[in-house]
Amino acid sequence: MEIGVFIPIGNNGWLISEAAPQYMPSFALNKEIVQKAEKYGFDFALSMIKLRGFGGKTQFWEHNLESFTLMAGLAAVTDRIKIFATAATLTLPPAIVARMASTIDSIAPGRFGINLVTGWQKAEYDQMGLWPGEQHYTDRYNYLAEYATVLRELLETGVSDFKGKYFQMTDCRVSPHPKDTKLICAGSSNEGLAFTAQYADYSFALGKGTNTPTAFGGVNDRLKAAADKTGRDVASYILFMIIADETDEAAMAKWQAYRAGADQEALAWLTNQAAPNAAAGATTNTAQLAAPESAVNLNMGTLVGSYENVARMLDEVAAVEGTAGVLLVFDDFVAGVENFGTKIQPLMTSRAGV
C-alpha cells in the first residue's frame, strides 16, 4: 500500500481547535515534513489550495501558501517522492496549469501530478469576482470535464483546439510537454466518481469515523462500478488523520482534548459555507466535511491509538479491496511523520520491505 502525506499548506493543519498545535504555514516547515517523508519511504506529497479561511479564534486557514509554487520549491529539494499540487480550476486556465506542470516536470521529471478541484466555498472566489454563481453547484462537473479535456490534450500532445461551452482553444500550444502527468480528483459523490472514472488517474476520498478503518469501503465499490463503465483503471487513495502515542490512553487523551477545544466560531463558518454544496447530496465530500459528528477535523477518518494499534488499523485499510494507498495528516506533522517512519511503518505488513 502506498503512503502519502497531505502537507499543511494552511495554518494549523486539519484541526479546527484551540487545543491543537497552532502554527503558520511556511516553506521551511513543509520542506522539513516532505524531506522527512521521503527519508521514510513515503510515496507522494500533496498540497491543497485554500483562498479563504474559516475565521474564529484560531483564524483557521486564514493563512495559506499557494500550491503550485510551494510544490515547485519542494520538487527542487527532493529526489524521489512524487509531488502533487492542487489547481483551483475557477482561478487558473488549463493552458496555464499545463505550462506550470511542464515547468515542474523539468524540475522533477516524472514526479509531478495535478489535483483538480471545482471549488465549493463561495467566499474564496466571490472575494475576487470569480464566483460563477449558484448554478456552479450543479454545473461544476460539466465545467471540470471541459477543463480536464483541454488539460489532457495539452499535457499529452502539446496542442489543443477544443471548443466547448466554457473553454475555446485555438491552436493553443504548450511545449515542452510532460509525458505522464497524473490527474487526481477528490469527488466522492456519484457525479464526482463518474468524473474521476472518466478523466482522472487517482481518486482521493475521505476515510470515515474514528477507529473504523474499513468503513470507507463503499466508496471503493462505487468507484469500481464507475470505472467499469469507462474501462479505465483508477486507483483509490483514502484520507486519514493519525493521532498516535505510546499508549491508546495517551493518544485518546489528545483526541478528546482537541474535540473539547473545538473552535466553534470557525466551525459555524464552515457549516454556513458548506450548506449550498452539501445540499447536493449526502455523499459529497463537503457534506462529510461539515457534518457535526467530528467537524473539528473535517470529519476525515481518524485513527487514534498506540503506534502498534495504528499500524494494525492501517493494515486493515490496506486489506480493503480496491485500496491503492492512504493519504495521511497528523496532529503534529513533524513529530507525526517521524513517529510514523520509526514506530508505525515498521509494524505494518502492508509496508513490509520499505
Curated annotation (Swiss-Prot):
Its EC number is 1.14.99.46. It is an enzyme of class 1 (oxidoreductase). The keyword RNA-binding does not apply. FMN binds at residues 49-50, 115, 124, 140-141, 189. Keywords: Flavoprotein, FMN, Monooxygenase, NADP, Oxidoreductase. GO terms for molecular function: alkanesulfonate monooxygenase activity; uracil oxygenase activity. It holds the Pfam family Bac_luciferase. GO terms for biological process: alkanesulfonate catabolic process; nitrogen utilization; uracil catabolic process. It catalyses: uracil + FMNH2 + NADH + O2 = (Z)-3-ureidoacrylate + FMN + NAD(+) + H2O + H(+); thymine + FMNH2 + NADH + O2 = (Z)-2-methylureidoacrylate + FMN + NAD(+) + H2O + H(+). The FMN-N(5)-oxide reacts spontaneously with NADH to produce FMN. Requires the flavin reductase RutF to regenerate FMN in vivo. Belongs to the NtaA/SnaA/DszA monooxygenase family. RutA subfamily. PANTHER family: ALKANESULFONATE MONOOXYGENASE (PTHR42847), ALKANESULFONATE MONOOXYGENASE-RELATED (PTHR42847:SF4). This is Pyrimidine monooxygenase RutA. It comes from Caulobacter sp. (strain K31). The gene is rutA.
